[in-house]
C-alpha cells in the first residue's frame, strides 16, 4: 500500500448516485445488496488513485472496481457516500469482503509504511508504521494476500520482468508498480554507493602493536 490523497467528489455524484441511492434504499429496505449506482464513477475514482489499486498498489489494466471501505452490509448508510469509496482490483475487493476497520484504509497509509523485498517480491510492513496500527498492518498483509500471496506475487513479477527486459524504464515501472520501483531504486543506490567507495575503505585497518 502507498499513500493516497482523498479523491474529491466528482460533479454529478450527488444527483446521480447519492440521492437516487438513498431513494432506492427507502423503497427496498430488505434488499441484500445496494443498487450499484456508483459504477459510472469508477473512472473518476481510478483517476484519483492514479489507476493503482488502493491495496496492492499495482496498475489495474482491467479498469478495477469500487470498494466500499466500510462495507455496505455493515454500514448501509454509507453505501452511496463518496468518502467511503476506494479504487481496488477485483481480487483485493473480494479478499477484503467485510473486514472493514480491520484492514488499513488507503487514505490513512503513510509514506514508506510498506516495502517490497527483492528478489522475492514479498511485501513487508516497515518500522514507519505507527505502533498503534502495526497489528492492522500485519492483518492487512495476511487478509489480502499482500505479503506473499501467489496471485499478487505473479502480478508483481510480470511488472518487474518488463523492467528487467528493458520494456519498462524505471519511471515506467514507478507508474505501474511504485513499490517495486522503490525497491529497485534502493538497490541501485546501494550499488552506486559501493561502486563509488574508495578502494581499501571498506574497513579501517589498525596496524598491529609491535
Please give the residue ranges for each predicted region:
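Short, charged surface segments at domain edges that flank catalytic/cofactor-binding sites
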Residues: 2-52, 75-80
